[in-house]
Amino acid sequence: KNPTAADRDVTMDDYLSLGVLTALDAINKVVPKRKVHGVGYCIGGTLLAIAAAAMAQQEDERLATVTMFAAQTDFSEPGELSVFISPAQLAMLEALMWKKGVLESRQMGGAFQMLRTYDLLWSPSVATYLKGERTGVNDLMSWNADGTRMAYRMHTDYLHQLYLNNDLAEGRYVALGE
């Protein structure tokens, strides 16, 4: 579900219980006692890793494997994204998200465009405006076009606890109350 203002207070635990764990419950109803090969992309991969760790603590063995693409579990070196992760930047972002209850997908896409300015801004601009060429679609443009909104509380907690404080890698992150 793509969140709306009504989902402002949806938490990371909600994403885990209503997303990952509910999906596993549904799968196990169709194919009982079968282990699932989980795949997560970007924040979905991080959520899957958190779910797998929480499940391991509860001796829940429904996951056979976990595969993550473009996902982080250690945020100590977030690369170019660190430009956007500081207490001041997060305060500004929180104020922006608070108004609508979500971070709009175009705002998230804009951050990624700023990280890949040559591929996503300059090269297409030069080709289109200066050379009069039509640029083809590339994988980065497709990925940015397939955006989702981020619920205020979930995204705020994600940025503070994982990016700013690195609570997951340092063993301080609490998932599903444990």
Locate predicted features.
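Predominant activation on well-ordered alpha-helical scaffold segments within soluble catalytic domains
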Residues: 21, 49, 156-160
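Gly/Ala-rich beta-loop-alpha elbow adjacent to hydrolase catalytic centers
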Residues: 40-44, 48
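Alpha/beta-hydrolase-fold enzymes
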Residues: 29, 33, 47, 51-155
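Conserved catalytic-core motifs of eukaryotic protein kinase domains, centered on the activation segment
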Residues: 7-10, 79
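Short, surface-exposed "cap/lid" segments of acyl-processing enzymes
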Residues: 1-6
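C-terminal subdomain of alpha/beta-hydrolase-fold enzymes, centered on the catalytic histidine
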Residues: 141-178
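Alpha/beta-hydrolase active-site loop
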Residues: 9-30
